[in-house]
């Protein structure tokens, strides 16, 4: 297990940095077109001039989305193979979710938690029964859910497990990603996330992912309150653990009285072919984190699910959010979950994912070295040369009508909305194949 300080020293020695082949977008026009809507170039320049430079977007300016497709401001149509990092599992602007938002937006949108509202309880009952937990704590963003889970784990550690006050530890897996707050980057092994932002959160330890012996060693420490892990690591490049890993995590956490926190923000809600990715191994974590597709991409909604022994350790006034549990977000989340159920999107993700991976396996191995994933959360690894890398492949995919984004330099994630059909998968694969063969 490495502390943040030890990891910083190691990384400093390695001299790791941002993928060197990522180039700046071509210089853009400086003036808006005299007539008509803004051009893509104008939009690129305006964001660059007035917005913080904390993202490096693929140069495409979108204005509309429907189902599995998006259109740019010039009217060009694209397959969306990112799905806003799996936030639009139900497809862009799903009519049922849009209607739910419209039905609520002119009634009541925000009360804060100072008062009750008539939608929160309906949502809480639905989501807890759906996932079989006693309680839900509603938040807004995925990273807020992660922060909430860490607070719950520490409070449980002190009040239930009996860890000495302020000595609780939480263990994370190397390669994890759950956000950009100070807590989240304190658990990160990615220097792009944490370098230059210390000092870091105490009591966070990191072990290798997919390594049960390392977890067993870490849990020997009686002050460990929780182990937080992604069932499949998304931002790390769709890293799928060995069969039995999650079962082993459950057994070790139970044995050592440690909470098993499953970060299902990206992997959950039908993305991997099951309601939750942990369902592939039929394990029940102590805490489950949901977000992204919990609103179908219409509104920021996240949730922390657990049983009373954990949830009720936090008392009134000890945690909260002005927007968490607001009636608009709750109404949207109910509709988003109903769409997943009614349209059997987990089953479709399972079937379409098999087809997609089978087709991706046919790509030339001198360019694509690895294909991996579950359901419709997939990735390919690009063999880098002076003429070919993941960024260049994504630019050419864009030119050919498909949007995807590199992660960790040589990896491209393919995660279309779960409403995609077989003929659409095959059409998209034709674009991918054509693009790869052009290098």
From Swiss-Prot:
Where does the record say the transit peptide is?
1-25
The domain of life is Eukaryota
Q: Which UniProt keywords apply?
A: Acetylation, Aminotransferase, Mitochondrion, Pyridoxal phosphate, Transferase, Transit peptide
* Cofactors demanded by this protein: pyridoxal 5'-phosphate
Q: Which Pfam families match?
A: Aminotran_3
Q: Which PROSITE patterns match?
A: AA_TRANSFER_CLASS_3
Give the EC number.
Answer: 2.6.1.13
Q: Which GO terms describe its biological process?
A: arginine catabolic process to glutamate; arginine catabolic process to proline via ornithine; L-proline biosynthetic process
Location in the cell reads:
Mitochondrion matrix
The UniProt entry's GO CC annotations, sorted and at most eight, read:
cytoplasm; mitochondrial matrix
GO molecular function, one example? pyridoxal phosphate binding
Q: Does the keyword Mitochondrion apply?
A: yes
List of residues that carry N6-succinyllysine: 102, 107, 362, 405
User: N6-acetyllysine is carried by which residues?
Assistant: 49, 66, 107, 362, 386, 392, 405, 421
Which function does this protein serve? Answer: Catalyzes the reversible interconversion of L-ornithine and 2-oxoglutarate to L-glutamate semialdehyde and L-glutamate.
Report the protein name in the record: Ornithine aminotransferase, mitochondrial
């Amino acid at each position: 297990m490495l502390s943040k300080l030890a990891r910083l020293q190691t990384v400093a020695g390695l001299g790791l940095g941002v993928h060197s082949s990522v180039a700046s977008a071509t210089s853009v026009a400086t003036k808006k077109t005299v007539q008509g809507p803004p051009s893509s170039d104008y939009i690129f320049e305006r964001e660059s001039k007035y917005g913080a430079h904390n993202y490096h977007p693929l140069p495409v300016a979108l204005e509309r989305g429907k189902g599995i497709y998006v259109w740019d401001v010039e009217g060009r149509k694209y397959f969306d193979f990112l799905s806003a990092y799996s936030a639009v599992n139900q497809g862009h602007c799903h009519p049922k979710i849009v209607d739910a938002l419209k039905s609520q937006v002119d009634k009541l949108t925000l009360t804060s938690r100072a008062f009750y509202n008539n939608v929160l309880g309906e949502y809480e009952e639905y989501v807890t029964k759906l996932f079989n937990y006693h309680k839900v704590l509603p938040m807004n963003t995925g990273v807020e859910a992660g922060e909430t889970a860490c607070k719950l784990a520490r409070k449980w550690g002190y009040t239930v497990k009996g860890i000495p006050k302020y000595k609780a530890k939480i263990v994370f897996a190397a390669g994890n990603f759950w956000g950009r707050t100070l807590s989240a980057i304190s658990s990160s092994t990615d220097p792009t996330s944490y370098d230059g932002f210390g000092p870091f959160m105490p009591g966070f330890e990191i072990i290798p992912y997919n390594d049960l012996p390392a977890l067993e060693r870490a849990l020997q420490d009686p002050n460990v309150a929780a182990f937080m892990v992604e069932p499949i690591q998304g931002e790390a490049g769709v890293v799928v653990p060995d069969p039995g890993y999650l079962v082993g995590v459950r057994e070790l956490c139970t044995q050592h009285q440690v909470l098993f926190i499953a970060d299902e923000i990206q992997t959950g809600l039908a993305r991997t072919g099951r309601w939750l990715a942990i369902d592939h191994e039929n394990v029940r974590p102590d805490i489950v984190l949901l977000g992204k597709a919990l609103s179908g991409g219409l509104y920021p909604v996240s949730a922390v699910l657990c049983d009373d022994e954990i949830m009720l350790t936090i008392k009134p006034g000890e945690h909260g959010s002005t927007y968490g549990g607001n009636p608009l977000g709750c109404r949207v989340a109910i509709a988003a979950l109903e769409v997943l159920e009614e349209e059997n999107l987990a089953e479709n993700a399972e079937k379409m994912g098999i087809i997609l991976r089978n087709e991706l396996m046919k790509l030339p191995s001198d360019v694509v070295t690895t294909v991996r994933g579950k359901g419709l959360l997939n990735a390919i690894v690009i063999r880098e040369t002076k003429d070919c890398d993941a960024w260049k492949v994504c630019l050419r995919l864009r030119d050919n009508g498909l949007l995807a984004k590199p992660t960790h330099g040589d990896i491209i994630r393919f995660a279309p909305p779960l409403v995609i059909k077989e003929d659409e998968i095959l059409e998209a694969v034709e674009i991918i194949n054509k693009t790869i063969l052009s290098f």
